[in-house]
């Protein structure tokens, strides 16, 4: 995950139809910046240009992979948009793999979520949680405190950073649960959090939905 390197320039967005609803994906020509379900805010999407899957297929072809895709644009077409189309293809392919149960690695994608240094540290911790596993807000707080050479860190502060994760599912904030097993604090909705963990094969007997 890149920090402080998200750059500027044109923003692009596309939609992915998932089993849990439509996912909005936002990128620029270099990095994936946001991904959110309909119940989650994608703040950059309002100022982003829309690109369709048809355009992606026309320009990038049908193949996708970590190394990128060979484009088919003419020399007169915009290179920045072409790069964004290639990146968006990779993001859509990642979600295809995820919902097919293939356990894709988030590091397949150049991620650059925008946020404070503290939030970036927390989001980096989220990327370390294995597929199908969970951790607690307190455990993340302990890890961040050690990296900052502090005696302790507020689990509530960590919860705020987790809740503001702008790249849902790929940066797996849904894998963070309360210390008592409560499935609490998911911006996409607790029912979505439950379904994501069940999809990944997590031990659901250990969790409960708060009343």
Regions found by a protein language model. Give the residues of each.
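Catalytic nucleophile loop of clan PA
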Residues: 176
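Short, positively charged loop/turn segments that connect secondary-structure elements
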Residues: 145-159
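Major-groove DNA-recognition helix of helix-turn-helix-type DNA-binding domains
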Residues: 162, 170
